[in-house]
From Swiss-Prot:
It is found in: Cytoplasm. The pumilio repeats mediate the association with RNA by packing together to form a right-handed superhelix that approximates a half donut. The number as well as the specific sequence of the repeats determine the specificity for target mRNAs. One of its GO terms (cellular component) is cytoplasm. Its main location: cytoplasm. Pumilio repeats lie at residues 82-117, 118-152, 153-188, 189-225, 226-264, 265-300. Gene3D superfamilies: Leucine-rich Repeat Variant (1.25.10.10). Sequence-specific RNA-binding protein that regulates translation and mRNA stability by binding the 3'-UTR of target mRNAs. It comes from the Eukaryota. This is Putative pumilio homolog 16. Residues 1-329 form the PUM-HD domain. It comes from Arabidopsis thaliana.
Amino acid sequence: MANNNSFSMSTMFNTIQEILNEEPLTVPSPPSRGGYSLFHIRKAEMDIQRIFNFMTGSEDLKDDISVLDTGTLMWMASLMTSDCDYFMVITTNKNGSKTLQKLMGMSDDMDVFFFEAIMRLFIHVMTDKYASYVTIQGMRVFQQDKRELMYDQILRYACFLAGDQYGCIALNEIITDLDDPYYRDQLLDIVANNALLLSNDAYGNFVVQHVLKLRDSRCTRNIADKLCGYCVELSFKKYGSYIVERLLEAGDVPMATVVLDLLACKTEMLIRLARSEYGNFVVCKALELTNEILTADLFYGLVNRLMPYRHLLHRSPRSKIATILDSMSVPN
């Protein structure tokens, strides 16, 4: 935040993490108060320091919150949210984040301050290791009208958050907690519609995996539809193979989508996949899960493609595929 006063405490707070590639935040001096005396400015600076020390201090101090009166709590909430930099310095501190979460939900009047600060800095707090939990807590304890406005922001920035190191973790927490049917379906649809992009992303793939674990049949089918034709490519990758395995475990249409992708690729590619570090798990799981009467056509389709190259698969020590093929008597 731009500030006319020169007061700086950067030496005390030089451990604060960078936020979205900005310089590390420091506790700035209070905004200019026009005709206020130097005494008033210095007092405001001391108040900020006291708030910071309390909020980021030892865990042993957190019990002190319960003995604070309403007026003091309101003063604290107002002061720590009066400037974006003040707020971020506290929320990006591990203890500061935990203490702030304890203050949230104590009164609607206090929550107004916290809500407005979060909304002003939404992307910043959602992509920080500790500050993101402040937003998550707000979505748990704020009144419905405030939560809905926060949900709207989540929908707007879902893909961006999914591709961020800490944003993806926060997004997964929110997906787990979200109990509003409308917003839940909207968020799952965003993940499903962007499944290919997210599955190939270093962090986004964790969101796709998380959503598949929820076993929401509609969303799982939508993800399978978006990944149709790309399952082989994903199976060569560590985290991509996890997503493909989740689709196989879902059974029905998602499983058929994966196996048909395997059968559609060239034989050379299929054998290379079956011998690869991650792909062999996908092929093995496809064989294990389709070896039932209802999916026998898929199973024998794979077996017939792989059987002539069984000798090559024996050379892959990690693979159980050759063992499965050896145990089979494929009908003519």
